[in-house]
């Protein structure tokens, strides 16, 4: 879309700021019995995979998108990457940890969980995690909630809006001995413009613009945000919702 060309640098900058916090990877490392090997499924361009490198002797990543894996290989040459759907992924080794960042809900979750019988070592840990819907504190909160309810909501994928039954599926898989849902606090400070840019970079706002709002909606949203909030920075809640399961 044209707005991505017009605001490309800003989109990339804000996505770079909304990174997974260290506590995610520290929590993963604290729960695994060993640090020999980790696998990141649905790894995209490797931005979540490389965070595992300081914690494990060997790190591997997989994604079904060949172009994403090409980018990951160029950016992180010290990591082994493979092109494959997570449901079909095979490796020559077993892993102490298998992780999945903001991608598990797009997969056949039951098939992936069954796959953990072969990918995980005995007592190995599977962790799927994702951002919650961001909440901007202050006057922008009401504004973005209105935009969501009146314009964006119908364009969100149902997998993002319905109850997340991952924990129940983990228990039903009979692969794991224990499992729990863990919420990790994650507050990020962004400028009001960066908050708007984050939403404009999401799939649901992009779909709204394609189908209803038009390309001019980006500038309109930025203008309204500037009128509503003149503070230099805004605290935004990007809490991480994670599921841990141990074999």
Q: In which residue ranges do the predicted regions lie?
A:
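Conserved class I S-adenosyl-L-methionine
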Residues: 1-33
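Conserved acidic residues
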Residues: 36, 57, 96
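Class I SAM-dependent methyltransferase SAM/SAH-binding core
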Residues: 39, 45-88
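A short acidic, Gly/Pro-enriched loop at the edge of an enzyme's catalytic core
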Residues: 88-98
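A short beta-strand submotif of the Rossmann-like class I SAM-dependent methyltransferase core
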Residues: 100-101, 109
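A short, conserved alpha-helix within the catalytic core of class I
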Residues: 107-116
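Conserved catalytic/acceptor-binding region of the Class I
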Residues: 117, 123-188
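Conserved Class I S-adenosyl-L-methionine
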Residues: 165-247
């Amino acid at each position: 879309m044209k707005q991505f060309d017009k605001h490309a640098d800003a989109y990339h900058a804000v996505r770079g700021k909304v990174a997974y916090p260290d506590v995610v990877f520290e929590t993963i490392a604290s729960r695994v019995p060993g640090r020999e090997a980790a696998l990141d499924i649905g790894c995209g361009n490797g931005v979540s995979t490389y965070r595992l490198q300081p914690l494990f002797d060997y790190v591997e990543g997989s994604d079904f998108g060949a172009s994403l894996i090409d980018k990951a290989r160029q950016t992180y040459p010290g990591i082994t990457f493979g092109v494959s759907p997570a449901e079909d992924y095979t490796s020559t080794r077993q892993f102490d940890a298998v992780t999945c960042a903001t991608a598990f809900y797009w997969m056949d979750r039951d098939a992936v969980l069954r796959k953990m019988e072969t990918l995980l070592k005995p007592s190995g840990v599977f962790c799927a995690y994702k951002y919650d819907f961001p909440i901007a504190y202050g006057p922008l909160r009401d504004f973005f909630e209105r935009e969501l309810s009146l314009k964006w909501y119908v364009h969100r994928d149902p997998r993002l809006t319905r109850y997340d039954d991952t924990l129940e599926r983990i228990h039903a898989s009979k692969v794991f001995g224990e499992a729990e849902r863990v919420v990790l606090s994650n507050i990020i400070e962004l400028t009001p413009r960066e908050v708007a840019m984050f939403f404009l970079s999401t799939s649901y706002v992009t779909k709204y613009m394609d189908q209803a709002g038009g390309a001019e909606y980006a500038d309109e949203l930025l203008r309204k945000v500037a009128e509503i909030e003149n503070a230099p920075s805004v605290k935004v809640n990007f809490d991480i919702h994670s599921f841990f399961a141990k074999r």
